[in-house]
């Protein structure tokens, strides 16, 4: 199976990612290469970047030759690729709406994936990262959600629902 290394910088987020299934946790506010190597790993096979690309060079250093990095986040930051090239490592972007926006031949797969994942969630085999439902969509709750995100201490997904 996979060995999952998550990042967290506070005790409550460390505990949270372990509850979600992380085998190891490294602090993203400290040098991560050294922390991963202290776990006995020179390189890792796969890296998923879920929030921003500030740690791009760390990811490139840690990815194994012929490994893969995936990101869901756009960036305006520089992304030097020379080290990726010499490692023959790959970068993959994931965007939820690619299939429907471009009407790809496999567009039905989005439906299939969402159906599968919702079934796994309903069966309790997958936990979501939903952490807080703040109430109806209005100016007040939007400001409150945005303020929480701006603190840099939010964890998981924050949801506004209803009107």
Question: What do the predicted segments below correspond to?
Answer:
Residues 17, 47, 91, 117, ...:
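Terminal peptide-recognition signature
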Residues 83-134:
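C-terminal substrate-binding/catalytic core of Rossmann-like NAD(P)-dependent dehydrogenases/reductases
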Residues 56, 113-115, 142:
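A general structural signal for well-ordered alpha-helical segments in protein cores
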Residues 2, 67, 89:
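Glycine-centered, small-residue-biased loops immediately flanking beta-strands
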Residues 63-64:
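Helix-to-beta-strand junctions that scaffold the AdoMet/dcAdoMet cofactor pocket
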């Amino acid at each position: 199976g996979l060995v999952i290394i998550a990042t967290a910088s506070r005790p409550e987020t460390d505990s949270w990612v372990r509850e979600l299934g992380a085998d190891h946790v490294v602090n993203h506010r400290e040098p991560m290469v050294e922390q991963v190597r202290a776990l006995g790993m020179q390189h890792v096979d796969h890296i998923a970047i879920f929030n921003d690309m500030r740690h791009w060079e760390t990811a490139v250093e840690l990815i194994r030759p012929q490994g893969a990095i995936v990101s869901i986040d756009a960036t305006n930051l520089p992304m030097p690729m020379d080290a990726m090239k010499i490692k023959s490592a790959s970068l993959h972007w994931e965007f939820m709406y690619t299939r429907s926006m471009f009407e790809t031949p496999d567009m039905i797969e989005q439906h299939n994936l969402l159906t599968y994942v919702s079934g796994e969630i309903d069966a309790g085999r997958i936990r979501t990262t939903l952490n807080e439902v703040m109430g109806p969509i209005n100016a007040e709750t939007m400001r409150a959600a945005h303020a929480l995100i701006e603190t840099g201490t939010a964890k998981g997904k924050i949801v506004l629902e209803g009107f």
